[in-house]
Amino acid sequence: MNKTIKIALAVGLGLLLNACSMVYQQPTGASVAIDKDTELALPLPAELGYSFTASQLISATWQDDTQQLPVQVEVTPDKVVLAGFSSWGTRILSLQYQNQAIETQVLSGLGATLPQPEQVLFNLMLTLWPVEAWAQPLQSIGWHLVDTDNSRTVFDDNQQAIIRIEYQADPGTHKTTGNIVFKHLTQGYTITIQTLNSTIVDNPSKS
């Protein structure tokens, strides 16, 4: 399975005992690798348009294998903070996106078995940030996004559909009130985001 979609929560006890510290990685620019040759700039946190905190359960399916990762998410006008946890409650990855830089931490020894925190951030932002926030970043690499009431699809520079996101929320409700299904059409994996609880607050108006 591609490293970016592996979510391993059942880690052996021996590995856990040898991996009890977080590894800090150097801050990087506000972009993520969406394939081996392409870097995509991310929208700013404030472009979401509101502040958001949530507990979510991410389920990743590839072929016949499904793994789960509980996450906590906080979005404010100046930053995005997320943390992923093991099934026993240990924080195993975290990320902060602020001041156009991304800083990540992964539990020592687990880097090869966990999704890259930047990819978790990309999936979150692609599902929730408005299409207007994504227009310029996608246009800069020749990609574009088509949005409907209950889905959005990302097309590459060859007009091939690459990612399709389906929203199962009831009409007129926030996208996170139902499951969000993220399908990578070329790499063949599916991510389901279930929001267990959330709080949404309008950002203060600029004077």
Give the ranges of each region predicted by the language model.
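Bacterial signal peptide processing site
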Residues: S21-Y24
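Extracytoplasmic beta-rich ectodomain segments of secreted or membrane-anchored proteins
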Residues: Q63-Q98
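Bacterial N-terminal signal peptides that target proteins for export
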Residues: M1-L9
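C-terminal motif of bacterial Sec signal peptides marking the signal peptidase cleavage site
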Residues: L16-A19
